[in-house]
Amino acid sequence: MKIAFLDIETTRLVADNGLGFILCCSMKIWHEKKIKTVRIDASKDYKKCLYNDTFVVDGIADWLIKEDPEVIVTYNGDFFDIPYINTRRLGANKKPLPPCRYMDHFKTSRYNLKLHSMGLNAMAEHLGVVHHKTRFEPIVWQRAMFGSKPDLDKIVHHCELDIVVLEECHDKVLPVLRKLKGVL
């Protein structure tokens, strides 16, 4: 079964008010080394319009169509990442993401484990995975939002590391996912 991991980094928690947009998205196929990251500053029109994330949402859809995973694994993606991407796509007069089966490990944390917190960091620390999430002050996101390449580079690294941590956690929690017996 082909499984993909996906994570986005955004400027706000809402996607429709003109202030929220996607800075980058990292995606990876399970147990492959290559991480595909689409970042807002890679658009040829980026300097003209710092908040136009159409290049990013197109890149996400293009990669998912090309790779055609059967399952997309996220952390809080059912509530945040996927609706955010679809909100941005629909707002740009694009079709929503192609249909796919989603696995959200936020739900794994909530319904299959009993951790002190339901965040990815708590899961990663408890499971003893090799990599760890990064943390930044809000000013890093603010500067990235206003075009600071060094700060956007930090956000991109953070997003790519989230994918690695998510995959490591995924490998460790698979045995507790009762609904997937015989599937994975």
Predicted regions and their residues:
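Short amphipathic alpha-helical segments
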Residues: 17-18, 85-87, 171
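Short helix-capping/linker segments at secondary-structure and domain boundaries
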Residues: 33, 115, 175-178
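Acidic, Mg2+-coordinating catalytic module of metal-dependent nucleases/exonucleases
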Residues: 72-73, 122-184
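Conserved beta-strand scaffold positions in the cores of enzyme catalytic domains, especially
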Residues: 3-5, 35-37, 102-103, 131
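Conserved DEDDh/DEDDy metal-dependent 3′-5′ exonuclease domain
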Residues: 36-117, 121-122
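Entry/capping segment at the start of metal-dependent catalytic domains
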Residues: 1-35
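Acidic active-site catalytic centers that drive phospho-/nucleotidyl reactions
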Residues: 7-9, 81, 104, 162
